[in-house]
C-alpha cells in the first residue's frame, strides 16, 4: 500500500480508533452497563435460576463488548497484545451466540434473531486459534439461517452491501470442504478485493497466497468507514482484520505455509498479526451461569465444545 492518499486515510483511521477506544473504556456509562449485567441480570439469576433468564444472552453480550473494547484500547493505544481481554471477549461472544440460539429455539424467542453480521465472529474464533468454537458457532448460525422467518438468509446480500459476513461464510466452507450453495450467495468475484484471497486460500504456494493476502489487506484498508458503501463498517475490525487472520489460520490448520507479508495493516498494531492460539480461559462467572441456564431453558444448550 504505497498510495499517499490511502496512507493518510489509514493514519486518520488509526487516530480515530485510538480516540474511540480510549473514549469508550473511560466512559462511566459503559462501566455501569458491564457492572449492571452482573448485578442486575446474572446475580439474581444465580440466586434462583429463573429471574430474567431470557436476558442472560444480552448480559453476556454486554460483558463481551466490555472485554473486547478494552482489548482494542490496549491494542491501538498501548501497542500491546491484549491476550487476556481478547480471550475473555471471544469466550463471552461465543456463549452469547449459543445462549441466544438456545432461546431462539425455545417457545419464547424473546426477540432474539440472527444478525447477518454474526457470521463475522466465526473468523474471530479462528483468529484466536479456537477451531472447535469456530465450527460450533458456524453450525449454530447455519441452523438459524434457514429456520428464521424473514431472516437475513432470505435477503439478497447486495441489500446490505456487507462483504465480511460472506467472506466469513466462504472461508468456513472452503476450510470444511463444503460445496453447499446458499440462496442469494454472491460469487467469489463479487467480493472484489477479497476474491484473490478466497481463490488462493488453499493454494500450495505460500507466495501466491501471500500476494493475494496483501491485495485483501489493501481492500480492507480502503473499506474502513461507516458509510453504506464501506467494506469494513464495524470499527472494532479496522485494526483487528479477523477475516484476513482467519484465512491465515485456515492455512495453518490445513498444514499449508503462511509467509510473512509486509503491509501497514499488519504492522500498525499487535492485533494485525496472527499469533499462536490463545488458551481458552476458564471464567468463574460462566462456569456458574451456563449450567443453570441450560437447566432453566430445558437443556437446549450443549456445554461441550
Language-model-derived ranges and their functions:
Residues 3-4:
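Solvent-exposed interaction surfaces and binding hotspots enriched for charged
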Residues 8-221:
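Eukaryote-skewed repeat-based solenoidal scaffolds used as protein-protein interaction platforms
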Residues 152-156, 225-237:
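Acidic, Ser/Thr-rich low-complexity linear motifs
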Residues 191, 220, 224, 236, ...:
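Residue-level signal for functionally critical sites in structured catalytic/ligand-binding pockets
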Residues 204-232, 270-280:
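Non-catalytic carbohydrate-binding regions of carbohydrate-active enzymes
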Residues 230-305:
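C-terminal structured domains
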Amino acid at each position: 500500500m504505497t498510495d499517499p492518499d490511502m496512507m493518510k486515510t489509514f493514519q486518520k483511521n488509526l487516530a480515530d480508533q485510538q480516540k474511540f477506544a480510549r473514549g469508550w473504556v473511560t466512559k462511566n456509562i459503559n462501566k455501569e452497563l458491564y457492572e449492571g449485567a452482573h448485578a442486575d441480570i446474572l446475580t439474581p439469576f444465580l440466586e434462583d435460576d429463573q429471574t430474567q433468564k431470557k436476558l442472560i444472552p444480552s448480559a453476556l453480550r454486554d460483558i463481551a463488548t466490555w472485554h473486547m473494547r478494552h482489548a482494542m484500547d490496549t491494542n491501538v493505544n498501548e501497542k500491546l497484545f491484549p491476550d487476556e481481554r481478547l480471550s475473555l471477549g471471544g469466550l463471552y461472544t461465543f456463549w452469547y451466540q449459543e445462549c441466544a440460539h438456545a432461546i431462539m429455539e425455545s417457545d419464547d424467542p424473546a426477540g432474539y434473531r440472527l444478525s447477518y453480521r454474526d457470521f463475522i465472529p466465526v473468523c474471530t474464533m479462528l483468529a484466536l486459534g479456537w477451531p472447535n468454537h469456530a465450527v460450533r458457532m458456524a453450525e449454530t448460525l447455519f441452523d438459524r439461517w434457514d429456520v428464521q422467518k424473514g431472516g437475513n438468509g432470505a435477503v439478497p446480500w447486495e441489500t446490505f452491501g456487507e462483504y465480511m459476513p460472506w467472506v466469513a461464510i466462504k472461508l468456513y466452507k472452503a476450510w470444511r470442504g463444503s460445496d453447499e450453495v446458499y440462496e442469494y450467495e454472491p460469487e467469489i468475484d463479487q467480493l472484489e478485493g477479497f476474491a484473490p484471497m478466497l481463490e488462493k486460500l488453499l493454494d500450495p504456494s505460500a507466495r501466491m497466497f501471500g500476494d493475494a493476502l496483501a491485495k485483501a489487506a489493501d481492500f480492507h484498508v480502503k473499506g474502513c468507514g461507516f458509510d453504506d458503501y464501506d467494506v469494513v463498517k464495524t470499527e472494532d475490525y479496522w485494526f483487528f482484520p479477523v477475516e484476513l487472520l482467519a484465512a491465515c489460520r485456515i492455512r495453518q490448520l490445513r498444514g499449508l505455509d503462511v509467509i510473512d507479508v509486509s503491509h501497514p495493516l499488519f504492522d500498525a498494531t499487535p492485533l494485525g498479526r496472527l499469533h499462536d492460539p490463545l488458551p481458552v480461559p476458564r471464567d468463574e462467572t460462566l462456569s456458574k451461569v451456563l449450567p443453570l441456564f441450560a437447566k432453566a431453558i430445558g437443556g437446549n444448550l450443549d456445554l461441550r465444545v
